[in-house]
């Protein structure tokens, strides 16, 4: 398509800009399981393996002071957040309008499930899994969590452009709490949308679970096996993760975001985390996240994968920080939204961004291990037969894994003209 070709040209032109030299470039990059531009797995999507990265400098402007909070409206440009959602959808699908892009996304999802040409249907429920991990009650938390402006931008897009009725949408964080700044902003605009969290009350609904809904592919000890009914009863799911690091696994992106759908305690210290961490020497092993990614009620229902990168963070907790010095951010917040129809490809791009900006992130070595397993789930390097429902039907490849060539050009195989691997489509707001 002509539009797609124009986008590709723009991407290549932007990616060849020189990179500013800064101190952290001397830091040795984390070790990874996969070498650059050596894709494995089967790409997914309308345009296979495509990841759309939208960048709107100035969308997030918090200065780090205590006089304001990162989530305040004064520190976030809602108009730019809406642009990020619209641009991501357009570039992901190749469509010229947001409305047509949604239609293409719904049609692709249903066609993959044997319902050729079907778009969104009347009464079909959508559950959105956000990452509000750093919350302790309904009171506002200054730590990094889901952005109220970005979430509202997505909800507006779903209601006004995709035509999804408010009562068919659920925003869920079953393992934690939906704080006031998030709930109040979104509920005041769309009072018909349901909000589900760990405790309920104050307008939120308390999470309920379908016990034993996930049967892990290997013995996972006392790891929670219940799944929130917000997801088991949904027809579609949207995974809206954050762009940040995490101790143990190196990163927390879309793959780990599923953990919050399980019947765990709001106090993380009381929960099991079996087979979350990669082997420190890079030896392949069974990874729990692959079971989440391939489960019929989680990854199997996912319409769209998103990574909210308004405030990308080096660490899992605390206030957002530090600012990003790499190109194209140049000392600002990343002010980005990343989207894909391929659950493996999107997290690979997230890893490449995080480890390029923060090469000294804790536990970043081999942080791509769960994605290498997911990309080759039908013939996993660890030898695991992934079957998250335990019904004797093993998973096949869940998507394509690949690292970009370098942090300067940021090109994947399809950006280099090959018919394999990932294609990264970047657009910067003018």
For each feature predicted by the language model, list its residue ranges.
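Bacterial N-terminal signal peptides
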Residues: 9-18
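Sec/Tat signal peptide C-region and signal peptidase I cleavage site
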Residues: 19-23
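Positively charged n-region of N-terminal signal peptides that target proteins for export
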Residues: 1-8
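Extended, low-polarity segments enriched in aliphatic/aromatic residues
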Residues: 25-122, 133-141, 145-153, 159-430
């Amino acid at each position: 398509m002509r539009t797609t070709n124009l986008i590709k040209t723009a991407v290549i032109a932007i990616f060849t800009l020189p990179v500013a030299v800064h101190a952290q470039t001397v830091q040795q990059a984390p070790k990874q399981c996969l070498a650059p531009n050596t894709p494995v797995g089967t790409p997914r999507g309308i345009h296979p393996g495509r990841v759309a990265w939208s960048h709107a400098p100035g969308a997030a402007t918090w200065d780090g002071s205590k006089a304001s909070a990162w989530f305040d409206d004064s520190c976030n440009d809602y108009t730019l957040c809406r642009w990020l959602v619209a641009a991501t959808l357009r570039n992901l699908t190749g469509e010229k309008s947001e409305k047509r892009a949604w239609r293409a996304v719904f049609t692709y999802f249903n066609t993959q499930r044997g319902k050729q040409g079907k778009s969104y249907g009347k009464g079909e429920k959508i559950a959105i899994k956000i990452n509000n991990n750093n919350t302790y009650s309904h009171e506002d938390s200054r730590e990094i969590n889901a952005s109220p402006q970005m979430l509202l931008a997505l909800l507006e897009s779903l209601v006004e452009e995709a035509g999804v009725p408010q009562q068919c949408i659920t925003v869920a964080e079953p393992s934690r709490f939906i704080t006031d700044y998030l709930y109040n902003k979104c509920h005041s605009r769309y009072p018909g949308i349901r909000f589900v969290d760990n405790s309920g009350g104050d307008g939120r609904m308390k999470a309920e679970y379908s016990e034993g809904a996930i049967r892990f592919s290997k013995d996972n000890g006392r790891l929670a096996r219940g799944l929130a009914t917000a997801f088991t009863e949904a027809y579609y799911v949207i995974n809206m993760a954050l762009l940040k690091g995490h101790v143990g696994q190196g990163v927390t992106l879309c793959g780990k975001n599923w953990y919050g759908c399980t019947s765990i305690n709001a106090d993380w210290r009381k929960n099991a985390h079996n087979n979350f961490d990669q082997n420190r020497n890079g030896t392949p092993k069974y990874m729990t996240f692959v079971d989440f990614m391939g489960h019929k009620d989680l990854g199997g229902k996912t319409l769209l994968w998103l990574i909210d990168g308004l405030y990308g963070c080096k660490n899992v907790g605390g206030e957002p920080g530090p600012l990003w010095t790499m190109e194209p951010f140049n000392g600002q917040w990343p002010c980005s939204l990343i989207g894909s129809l391929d659950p493996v490809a999107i997290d690979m791009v997230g890893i490449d961004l995080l480890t390029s900006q923060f090469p000294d992130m804790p536990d970043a070595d081999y942080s791509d291990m769960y994605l290498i397993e997911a990309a080759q789930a039908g013939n996993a390097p660890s030898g695991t037969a992934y079957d998250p429902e335990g019904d004797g039907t093993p998973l096949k490849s869940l998507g394509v894994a690949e690292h970009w060539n370098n942090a300067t050009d940021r090109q994947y195989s399809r950006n280099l003209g090959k018919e394999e691997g990932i294609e990264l489509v970047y657009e910067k707001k003018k």
